[in-house]
């Protein structure tokens, strides 16, 4: 038995209509990511991203750790939610899409809040704990 809540098309349409506030940089990043084909399904939705941003804001997070960045959309949302001098440490074991992500972080003016780490997530997590 699944613990997930099934979301029908009416709920998805409502969320898309009323929760996502369009953002040119985010929309461009999503559009370019879709051109990558099947792998694009790894990307979060803009609604999920705005929810993550909200969580970061209301918790007044100064630093965040992200394991797995893909094309950097969740990283961008987290960075937007961080306090002024906050940092997100974005870990990935592949740099395949790093330059792609960096372009959009710079356009969104959050690149100064992002520290990219090229490392296996398990090792990075252990290093952060130690």
What are these regions (language model features)?
Residues 36-37, 86:
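Short amphipathic alpha-helical segments at helix-loop
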Residues 29:
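Beta-strand-loop-alpha "switch" segments that mediate conformational coupling across diverse proteins
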Residues 1-24, 38:
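N-terminal auxiliary segments of SAM/dcSAM-dependent transferases
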Residues 19-21, 37-50, 57:
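Conserved SAM-binding loop and adjacent beta-strand
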Residues 46-130:
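S-adenosylmethionine/decaboxylated-SAM
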């Amino acid at each position: 038995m699944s613990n997930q809540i099934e979301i029908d098309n009416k709920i998805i349409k409502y969320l898309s209509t009323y929760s996502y506030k369009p953002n040119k940089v985010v929309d461009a990043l999503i559009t370019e990511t879709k051109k990558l084909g099947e792998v694009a399904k790894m990307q979060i939705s803009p609604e999920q991203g705005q929810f993550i941003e909200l969580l970061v804001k209301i918790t007044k997070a100064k630093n965040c750790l992200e394991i797995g960045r893909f094309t950097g959309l969740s990283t961008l949302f987290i960075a937007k939610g961080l306090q002024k001098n906050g940092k997100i440490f974005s870990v990935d074991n592949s740099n395949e899409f790093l330059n792609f992500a960096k372009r959009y972080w710079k356009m969104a003016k959050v690149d100064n809040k992002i520290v990219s780490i090229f490392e296996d997530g398990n090792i990075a997590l252990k290093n952060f704990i130690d």
